[in-house]
Amino acid sequence: MVMVMIIGGALLMKDAPNQPARTGNNAGEGDYSLAESMRKPQYWMLALMFLTACMSGLYVIGVAKDIAQGMVRLDAATAANAVTVISIANLTGRLVLGILSDKMPRIRVITLGQVVSLVGMAALLFAPLNEMTFFAAIACVAFNFGGTITVYPSLVSDFFGLNNLAKNYGVIYLGFGIGSICGSIIASLFGGFYVTFCVIFALLIVSLAISTTIRQPRREAWEHARA
C-alpha cells in the first residue's frame, strides 16, 4: 500500500514553473542570511510560534490515550481511537491549511490554526469532558499541528527569503525537537496534565497575539536609499 501511494504521488509530481529572476536594486532585498535573520525580533517570534505548535501537538499526541483514560474515564479500546482521530485531524490540517496558504497570507493561515488549537486546548482545560468533546478537542490541536508543519517553511521564506531558507528554517525547526520534550518535562515536574495544558494554553495566547501583530522585517538601508 505504501509503495502504491509513493509511486502514485511521484507520477503526479510536476516541476514548478520557472520564475523570472529579479534584477536591479531590489534583487535579493528580501533575502537574509542566518545571522541577519537571528538579529531580527520577527525571527524569534516565528520560532516561539513554531515551538508552541509543536509542543501542543506532540504532547497531546503522545499522551492522548492516557488523557482519555485518566481525565475522561474511557475504556482502553475507546481511548485507543484517539490515535485514529489525531491522524485524520493531522492530515486534514495539512491539506486545508496548505491549500489556504496559496490563497491568503500565510501568517493569517497560522493565525487560523492557532485559533482552532486554542479552542481545543480550552475545551481540555475548561469544558466538561466526555467522549465527543475529548475527541473534538484533540482533533483541534492535531489540526493546527499538522497545518503548521506544512505551512511554516513557506512562511519563513516570506519573511526572510528563499536563498538561505534551509538555514533559517533549520534553526526554527529545532523547536520540533525542543517542543517534543518540553511538555513531558513540565508534566514530570508538576505531576499531571493540568499544569502542562495551562502552560500550552498561555503559550497559544501569546503566539496568537504575535501572529496578529507581526510584520515582515524591512532593511533600513534600502528604506533610506528610497527616501
Predicted regions, residues:
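Extracytoplasmic gate region of multi-pass secondary transporters
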Residues: 35-99
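Structural signature of the two symmetry-related core transmembrane helices
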Residues: 108-123
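Flexible cytoplasmic inter-helical loops of multi-pass small-molecule transporters
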Residues: 14-32, 220-226
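Symmetry-related core transmembrane helices of the 12-TM Major Facilitator Superfamily/SLC fold
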Residues: 1-11, 195-213
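Helix-to-loop junctions at the C-terminal end of transmembrane segments
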Residues: 94-105, 191
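Juxtamembrane helix-start elements in MFS-like secondary transporters
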Residues: 74-83, 130, 134, 165, ...
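A late C-terminal transmembrane helix in Major Facilitator Superfamily
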Residues: 159-192
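Intracellular juxtamembrane helix-capping segments at the cytosolic ends
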Residues: 147-160
